[in-house]
Amino acid sequence: MGRATSARNWRFITPVGELAFKEALAKGVVIFGLQRVPSVARLKEYGHIVVASGYRPSLHLAALPQQASVDCCRLISWGLGMPCYPLASYLNLTLTPSNPILHTSRLYRLFKDYRLGKVYKHLPLFYEDWDDETTRLLFKCDAEVQALCQHLSEFDLSGIRSLKEHYGQVEVAAFSAKIRSIASFKGLKTPGLVTTGGYLPDFSSRYFSADFAFGLKLILQVGNLAQVALPTCQMIMTWYESFHSNTRKCPVRAMGLTRGPIWWLSTVNSVGLKN
């Protein structure tokens, strides 16, 4: 690891980092990210103990510049003790239909009727109470992302698998049952805050703060650049923006991520749409 890091500055960031770190890339910084997390992590004792479960058999990684991917894979394999394979381009991370549509579609299903002052008497478990309505919504989002990938036919996006393929279920009921049965998902709660009479959505949860602004929004912006409509994804994003307008709490606006073009999406090259 020492030899790999001696000649370069290395940073490990999330799959949208190529957009926000253009200046760093110009200075020779290597940016890399994982397509999916190695495992599910749960906090047991704050600041002391985290329990990890459901480890994947292998990981996939992309880097900028692309030629650094192999070295980055070696670094991750060494650090985590598991195989890691390079992806063809960083877009294989940015457009992967994981949490950016999995979490956001579920949150829309659970809180689509939310309004200021509304209190929920009960919040279902996030995964164990997964229902077919959520799956149908998720399938629409998944199909839209796949259509976007097919439109970008000049790029090798073979690393982006649909959620149906990823979970091995193509029918709504079977997919819902699969999500409910995953052992590492057991007991995971819907992000909520206890209040008088029940619960409120916890907008500070990473399910909200990360997966909308730095996940779903980026997919929509790539679609915007490619002139490919993603109506279901946009509906969910518009819902989130419509009631969550405080810039201090809403990264979508706080980071300049609006419905229109944003400063680091001014060119096609800025999202890696050029080999």
Each language-model region and where it sits:
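Substrate/ligand-engaging "lid" and interaction regions
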Residues: P38-C141, P261, S266-K274
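NAD(P)-dependent Rossmann-like dehydrogenase/reductase catalytic/cofactor-binding core
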Residues: L116-K121, E128, T135-N275
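Rossmann-like NAD(P)(H) cofactor-binding subdomain of soluble oxidoreductases
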Residues: M1-I49
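Short secondary-structure capping/junction motifs at helix and strand boundaries
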Residues: A26-F32, P83-L87, F155, A229-P231
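Conserved beta-strand termini and adjacent loop/short-helix elements that scaffold enzyme active sites
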Residues: L34-R36, L87, I160
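Broad structural signal for hydrophobic residues in well-ordered alpha-helices, predominantly aliphatic
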Residues: V16, A20-F21, I76-S77, V222
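Secondary-structure boundary elements
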Residues: K22-E23, Q67, W78-P83, A147-F155, ...
